[in-house]
A protein has these predicted regions:
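A glycine-anchored, Pro-Gly-centered beta-turn/N-cap motif
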Residues: 39, 63, 102-104
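Short amphipathic, basic-aromatic surface patches that mediate peripheral association
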Residues: 46-57, 118
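Short coil-to-beta strand junction motifs in C2/discoidin
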Residues: 57-65, 125
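Short acidic/polar inter-strand loop motif in beta-rich domains
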Residues: 74-76, 113-124
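Short beta-strand elements
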Residues: 121-134
């Protein structure tokens, strides 16, 4: 009976959001909002008020970045973020990436996820920026 209780409790613990301090802030260091970039360019991620930890590491006050590319409607903030062509996961704790996008206007935004890719109970979401790819 004890094992059955554990089996029921574990999934809810895994699916639980983590808490982020109110002052936590995610931001894109570069490129700048409105910048024109080459088809291949580097995006540098910023985070203040929290630390970066790889996915799978359940350490309070930490998370890892997810880059939202051309996302008009945010995904569920209560479930693990899906990995798609528009939602890039950086579960290794990376703080930058090189993107290759087609010419035109694009939007970029960061969303911090906890150890199981779930956004924090008070989501740490950057401002959305726009870039123009040459």
């Amino acid at each position: 009976m004890c094992l059955m209780s554990l089996g029921i409790a574990v999934p809810s613990a895994i699916a639980a959001p983590s808490h982020a301090p109110a002052e936590a802030k995610a931001y894109i260091i570069s490129p700048a909002d409105g910048q024109t970039v080459s088809p291949e360019f580097t995006v540098k991620f910023g985070l203040s008020g929290m630390g970066v930890a790889p996915a799978g590491i359940d350490k309070p006050g930490t998370g890892h970045h997810h880059l939202l590319i051309d996302v008009d409607k945010l995904p569920s903030l209560e479930d693990p973020l899906p990995s798609t062509t528009q939602i890039k996961h950086f579960g290794g704790g990376q703080t930058e990436t090189t993107l290759e996008l087609p010419p035109g206007e694009h939007t970029l935004q960061l969303l911090l996820g906890n150890y199981s890719h779930i956004p924090h109970d008070n989501p740490v979401l950057s401002e959305k920026i726009e870039v123009t790819v040459e």
